[in-house]
């Protein structure tokens, strides 16, 4: 789950991480009032959307007086920002962060992520702050420094100091930088983050170490123990199909293709997408109905898949273990009738009650193409979609 920058900064502030003072605004008048309350000569007007690259897209402006705050707020609020992370459709700006200006001396990058190869949290940092870390990793990987953190003891002071020295934090500010990184790590662990990224971390003219931006991403499976984080969720920033899927405990992720996929089990779902690509097709989604799907869940899964106008055909690939193939077959038939399905539909069933499931499909009188294997099903749906 993602949250907005201003929310992330509030979380970090509670862990002793230094961030600029700022206020959120939902209207132009609120933006002007927020700037008045901050009382600084320079304010930064920042679009709040769940995506990076806002500055390059015109979503971050420096205002030197209240009139400029009003002008920038009017120009940003309600507009659609298109960045490298939003896709071509972009995201509408519905809120702003009005923040006090900062006398920046130097920009850095600091981030915490999960390294799945080592099963550890890794602290990454670079002198190349303010630019995309992926770009730095590609062009000058030697400028990225890493510290792998033992989960038994957590981030150690010597590791934070080593990072600070490696990225050339001024000696007199190393203590502040260490405190900053320790606070960031505490927030990462206690709030079950999957990413905590500060880009840029800055040193200022008045001798402070501060987070000018904050990107926090949380493990959705752990939100039950962080109710305060769950309250920060902004549904307007999320895909409506993903929200609908979550109501029925369906794991749905939209993709760019035209072949809808309905599968049980994440591993089988990924294998299904791979084999569709192998036969030169393009999956339109990842959709895992889970191990205990009912006819109702299958029906809702169909509706979610079909809400994507790019879908030209559907491949249902089910291995019945806990889930019975006859239940899936009944769900497929019910869903097909309810939604008035006119697109090509290929179904591959295997496992518990498979013969009964196939019998139900064959006797349904509906235009359902049966597949004998996963490869057979992938070839058939790719051929039907054309």
Swiss-Prot record:
Residues holding Mg(2+): 199, 213
EC number(s) on file: 6.2.1.5
Subunit note: Heterotetramer of two alpha and two beta subunits.
One Gene Ontology molecular-function label: succinate-CoA ligase (GDP-forming) activity
Pfam families the UniProt entry points to: ATP-grasp_2, Ligase_CoA
Catalytic activity: succinate + ATP + CoA = succinyl-CoA + ADP + phosphate; GTP + succinate + CoA = succinyl-CoA + GDP + phosphate
Name of the top EC class for this enzyme: ligase
Family membership: Belongs to the succinate/malate CoA ligase beta subunit family.
Pathway: Carbohydrate metabolism; tricarboxylic acid cycle; succinate from succinyl-CoA (ligase route): step 1/1
Gene3D superfamilies found in the cross-reference section: ATP-grasp fold, A domain, ATP-grasp fold, B domain, Succinyl-CoA synthetase domains
ATP-grasp domain sequence ranges: 9-244
InterPro entries from the UniProt entry: ATP-grasp, ATP-grasp_succ-CoA_synth-type, ATP_grasp_subdomain_1, SUCC_ACL_C, Succ_CoA_ligase-like_bsu, Succinyl-CoA_synth-like
SUPFAM superfamilies reported for this sequence: Glutathione synthetase ATP-binding domain-like, Succinyl-CoA synthetase domains
S-S bridge residues: none
Gene: sucC
GO BP, sorted A to Z: succinyl-CoA metabolic process; tricarboxylic acid cycle
Listed NCBIfam families: PRK00696.1, sucCoAbeta
Cofactor: Mg(2+)
Binding site for ATP: 46, 53-55, 99, 102, 107
The entry's keywords: ATP-binding, Ligase, Magnesium, Metal-binding, Nucleotide-binding, Tricarboxylic acid cycle
Name of the protein in its database record: Succinate--CoA ligase [ADP-forming] subunit beta
Entry GO terms, CC: cytosol; succinate-CoA ligase complex
Cofactor-binding details, from the entry: Binds 1 Mg(2+) ion per subunit.
Positions of substrate binding: 264, 321-323
Protein's job: Succinyl-CoA synthetase functions in the citric acid cycle (TCA), coupling the hydrolysis of succinyl-CoA to the synthesis of either ATP or GTP and thus represents the only step of substrate-level phosphorylation in the TCA. The beta subunit provides nucleotide specificity of the enzyme and binds the substrate succinate, while the binding sites for coenzyme A and phosphate are found in the alpha subunit.
């Amino acid at each position: 789950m993602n949250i907005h920058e201003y929310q992330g900064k509030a979380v970090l502030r509670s862990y002793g991480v230094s961030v600029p003072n700022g206020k959120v605004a939902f209207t132009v008048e609120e933006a002007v009032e927020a700037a008045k309350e901050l009382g600084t000569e320079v304010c930064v007007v920042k679009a709040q959307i769940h995506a990076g690259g806002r500055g390059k897209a015109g979503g971050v402006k420096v205002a030197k007086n209240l009139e400029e705050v009003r002008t920038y707020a009017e120009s940003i609020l309600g507009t659609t920002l298109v960045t490298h992370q939003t896709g071509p459709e972009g995201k509408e700006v519905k809120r702003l962060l009005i923040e006090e200006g900062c006398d920046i001396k130097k920009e850095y990058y600091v981030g915490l992520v999960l390294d799945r190869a080592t099963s550890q949290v890794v602290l990454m940092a670079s002198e190349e702050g303010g630019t995309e870390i992926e770009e730095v990793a590609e062009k000058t990987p030697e400028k990225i420094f890493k510290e792998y953190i033992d989960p038994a003891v957590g981030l150690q002071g010597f590791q934070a100091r080593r990072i600070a020295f490696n990225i050339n934090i001024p000696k007199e500010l190393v203590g502040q930088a260490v405190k900053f990184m320790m606070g960031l790590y505490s927030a990462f662990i206690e709030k079950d983050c999957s990413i905590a990224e500060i880009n840029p971390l800055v040193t200022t003219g008045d001798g402070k170490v501060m987070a000018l931006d904050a990107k926090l991403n949380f493990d959705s499976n752990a939100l039950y123990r962080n109710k305060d984080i769950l309250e920060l969720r902004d549904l307007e920033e999320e895909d409506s199909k993903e929200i609908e899927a979550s109501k029925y405990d369906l794991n749905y992720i939209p993709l760019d293709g035209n072949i809808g996929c309905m599968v049980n089990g994440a591993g089988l779902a990924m294998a299904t997408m791979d084999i569709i690509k192998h036969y030169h097709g393009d999956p339109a989604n990842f959709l895992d109905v889970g191990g205990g799907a009912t006819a109702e869940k299958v029906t809702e899964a169909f509706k979610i898949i079909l809400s994507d106008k790019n879908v030209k055909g559907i491949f249902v690939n089910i291995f019945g273990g806990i889930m019975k193939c006859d239940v899936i077959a009944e769900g497929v038939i019910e869903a097909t009738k309810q939604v008035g399905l006119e697109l090509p539909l290929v179904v591959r069933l295997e496992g518990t009650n498979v013969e009964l499931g196939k019998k139900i499909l064959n006797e349904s009188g509906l235009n359902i193409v049966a597949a004998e294997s996963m490869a057979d099903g992938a070839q058939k749906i790719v051929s039907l979609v054309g």
